[in-house]
Swiss-Prot record:
InterPro entries: CAP/MinC_C, MinC, MinC_C_sf, MinC_N, Septum_form_inhib_MinC_C. The lineage of its organism: Bacteria, Pseudomonadati, Pseudomonadota, Gammaproteobacteria, Alteromonadales. This is Probable septum site-determining protein MinC. The keyword Amino-acid biosynthesis does not apply. Belongs to the MinC family.
């Protein structure tokens, strides 16, 4: 029997949400270019949903906004929090209207076994390590231009100078711990910091643990 050429199945994905707080495209362009200059790898090619709940109805040219974002190599898959008028604009632009998931209690499906990967060497520029459904422990340094990613937490017993992304599947309890924090970028469940954010907290080039506090990152120094 010939296997069907396509199947429709339900699934869930973690998407980053870009909150649009004004209809002023010049202002959006200015702020967007600043963020892209800080961390281009974090945004470019990543699927995004536009949250339009803060936009005054009838003021935003959604087609022009989409063209602006696409010109910066951003991938827009839909909108949320849109008024009826903006939803019609979204439909004309080929964008889906996405509703945020409700926090209902559902039976938990069988989960994959939790894993921990241990790396006993330096992670060098150009290298990427990803741990699915687990934690990453590194006994060594993560150099400039290197990326370490885990669905769970990341512990680095050495210097972090590259990028570290924990909670890649949306796990908000994930943490990033390093003996020497001097990263290009740190991200937990889609919230990110650059080196200057750590400088404001006085922990640059020191040991520390980064975690989520509500919807913002926070860091505490550690006596490592």
């Amino acid at each position: 029997m010939r296997k069907a050429s396509l199947e429709l199945k339900g699934s869930s994905f973690t998407l980053s949400v870009l909150h649009i707080n004004t209809s002023d495209l010049d202002s959006i362009t200015l702020d967007l270019d600043k963020k892209l200059a800080q961390a281009p790898q974090f945004f470019i090619g990543a699927p995004l949903v536009l949250n339009l709940s803060a936009v005054e109805d009838g003021k935003l040219d959604l087609a022009a906004l989409k063209d602006l974002l696409v010109s910066r190599q951003l991938v827009i898959v839909g909108v949320t929090g849109a008024s009826e008028a903006l939803s019609e604009q979204a439909k004309a632009c080929g964008l889906a209207s996405v509703k945020a998931g409700k926090q209902t209690q559902m039976p938990s499906p069988p989960s994959e076994p939790r894993t921990t990967r241990i790396v006993r060497q330096n992670v060098r520029s150009g290298q990427q390590i990803y741990v699915k459904n687990g934690d990453l422990i590194i006994f060594g340094a993560v150099g400039n231009g290197a990326e370490v990613i885990a669905d769970g937490s990341i512990h680095i017993y050495g210097a972090l100078r590259g990028k570290a992304m924990a909670g890649a599947n949306g796990e908000r309890d994930a943490v990033i711990l390093a003996s020497h924090l001097e990263p290009e970028l740190i991200s937990i469940a889609g919230q990110y910091w650059l080196t200057e954010n750590l400088q404001k907290h006085g922990v640059t080039a020191k040991s520390g643990c980064v975690r989520l506090d509500g919807d913002s990152l926070t860091v505490e120094a550690l006596p490592l």
